[in-house]
Amino acid sequence: MPVDPILRQAISEVTTALARVAATESLGRYAEALVAATAAVDAARATGHTPVIAEALARRGDLELRLSRFDEA
């Protein structure tokens, strides 16, 4: 985890958003979860922190597969 407190906060916010995405997905609200996951990917990319970017991309890819969006996944 980075030392910079602002970056740590941004990463924490992305992680929290991804937890919400997972909860939404578990309720079967896949399209809604995909929208939130896409926003999380954008937020993760803004941090520049590779592990959180990878986590967000993986979550979004899983949702795209679940919604049969194979080209996007």
PLM regions and their residue ranges:
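Amphipathic alpha-helical segments of tetratricopeptide repeats
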Residues: 38-49
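TPR-repeat structural position
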Residues: 30, 50, 70-71
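Tetratricopeptide repeat
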Residues: 33, 39-40, 73
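Structural signature of alpha-solenoid helical repeat scaffolds
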Residues: 8-9, 48
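Residue register of alpha-helical TPR repeats
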Residues: 13-15, 55-57
